[in-house]
């Protein structure tokens, strides 16, 4: 596939848009990064995640239904940390402090994925080639989900609004146990090469993969 190329913009739309956004925050006395509400939410999510893990693993209920409900809650907390902590941290908007953003972003590594790969596929590729089929990895859920009109249509897609939650949960496992490694060894996301990984990036990739396997598979 030919990778799309964009001409340098000749209009001032982007400049004006960024200026108006900046003016909005300044005029209303708001920060463009997280505040106490976000930090409190992050603490609640992380502590709930840790507490539920301990109860599930070391104080397992005798009632199967209770364990099943806890597993569902555990999955929701995983998604909650991903969307509310990791996402903002990896975008550099969780805090004004760089180390806190990096710490929030690293929560993804603890959940089994890798923040370096995520930044490559989301911050760089998704936000450059947004919703372009064959390039934007964030809309590649074929053949289970059709997220773009250019993707091949299967009869099952007429029901995807009913099964998409289940499909997304399975895609998460596919992500952490397959596609992360695929990107790592191929050195690219789809047709786009990723930045060269430093030694610390390799160490973080394998270290957290082993840690995740030990905590969530072996234990």
Where are these regions (language model features)?
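Short, charged cytosolic
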Residues: 1-23, 170-186
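Membrane-embedded catalytic scaffold of the fatty acid hydroxylase/desaturase
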Residues: 73-197
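Juxtamembrane membrane-interface segments of multi-pass membrane proteins
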Residues: 11-24, 118, 122-130
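Generic amphipathic alpha-helical segments used as scaffolds and interaction surfaces in large
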Residues: 4-12, 60, 153, 198-202
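Alpha-helical bilayer-embedded segments of polytopic membrane proteins, i.e.
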Residues: 32-82, 109-110, 161-173, 196-219
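Short intracellular "coupling" helices and adjacent cytoplasmic loop segments at the cytosolic face
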Residues: 2-11, 29-32, 112-115
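Membrane-interface, cytosolic juxtamembrane amphipathic helix immediately N-terminal to a transmembrane helix
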Residues: 18, 22-39
């Amino acid at each position: 596939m030919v990778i799309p190329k964009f001409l340098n913009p000749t209009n001032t739309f982007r400049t004006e848009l960024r200026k108006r956004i900046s003016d909005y925050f300044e005029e209303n006395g708001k920060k463009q990064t997280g505040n106490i509400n976000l930090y409190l939410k992050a603490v609640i999510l992380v502590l709930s995640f840790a507490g539920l893990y301990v109860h599930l693993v070391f104080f397992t209920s005798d009632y199967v239904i209770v364990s099943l409900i806890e597993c569902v809650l555990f999955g929701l907390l995983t998604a909650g940390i991903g969307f509310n902590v990791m996402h903002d941290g990896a975008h550099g908007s969780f805090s004004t402090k760089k180390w806190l953003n990096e710490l929030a972003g690293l929560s993804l590594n603890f959940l089994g994925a890798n923040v370096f790969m995520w930044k490559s596929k989301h911050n760089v590729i998704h936000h450059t080639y947004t919703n372009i089929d064959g390039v934007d990895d964030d809309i590649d859920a074929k053949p289970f989900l059709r997220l773009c009109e250019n993707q091949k249509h299967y009869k099952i897609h007429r029901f995807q609004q009913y099964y998409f939650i289940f499909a997304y949960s399975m895609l998460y496992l596919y992500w952490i146990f397959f596609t992360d490694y695929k990107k790592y060894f191929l050195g690219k996301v789809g047709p786009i090469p990723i930045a060269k990984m430093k030694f610390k990036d390799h160490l973080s990739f394998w270290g957290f993969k082993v840690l995740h396997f030990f905590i969530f598979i072996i234990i």
